[in-house]
Swiss-Prot record:
Protein name: Acidic phospholipase A2
Compartment(s) where it occurs, according to its Swiss-Prot or TrEMBL record: Secreted
E.C. numbers: 3.1.1.4
Main location, first listed in the record: secreted
Entry similarity comment: Belongs to the phospholipase A2 family. Group II subfamily. D49 sub-subfamily.
Cross-referenced PROSITE patterns: PA2_ASP, PA2_HIS
MF terms in GO: calcium ion binding; calcium-dependent phospholipase A2 activity; phospholipid binding; toxin activity
Active site: H47, E89
Source organism (scientific name): Bothrops jararaca (Jararaca)
Keyword terms of this UniProt record: Calcium, Disulfide bond, Hemostasis impairing toxin, Hydrolase, Lipid degradation, Lipid metabolism, Metal-binding, Platelet aggregation inhibiting toxin, Secreted, Toxin
Domain of life: Eukaryota
Length: 124
């Protein structure tokens, strides 16, 4: 679920970052349109696409299990439910993407607003 995604982001980035990404660019937050503005926004675009491929459960509300290793920074998705594992994998890839692209985060894209994202969306 989205709360777990926020927790995972905080784990992987080793700081409280959820609100920095909630309304970032054209794709971070609820939904998305237009073209991703930078590598950070592309993490959200890919995450949205990943959620769009999940069938049989709701990525925004269904919870899953995962473990986080502080030693090596890895997230491992657990549980027996394949659909929930898919949600977890979408979140794991996005959280890792945010960490790996932290240097691209640009405050000018925080609270960017959909009015600035009017181009045609690219396909997943």
């Amino acid at each position: 679920d989205l709360w777990q995604f926020g927790q995972m982001m905080n784990d992987v980035m080793r700081e409280y970052v959820v609100f920095n990404y909630l309304y970032y660019g054209c794709y971070c937050g609820w939904g998305g349109i237009g073209k991703p503005r930078d590598a950070t926004d592309r993490c959200c675009f890919v995450h949205d696409c990943c959620y769009g491929k999940v069938t049989g459960c709701n990525p925004k509300t269904d919870s899953y299990t995962y473990t986080y290793s502080e030693e090596n920074g890895d997230v491992v998705c657990g549980g027996d439910d394949l659909c929930k594992k898919q949600i977890c994998e979408c979140d794991r890839v996005a959280a890792t993407c945010f960490r790996d692209n932290k240097d691209t985060y640009d405050t000018k894209y925080w609270l960017y607003g959909a009015k600035n994202c009017q181009e045609e969306s690219e396909p997943c």
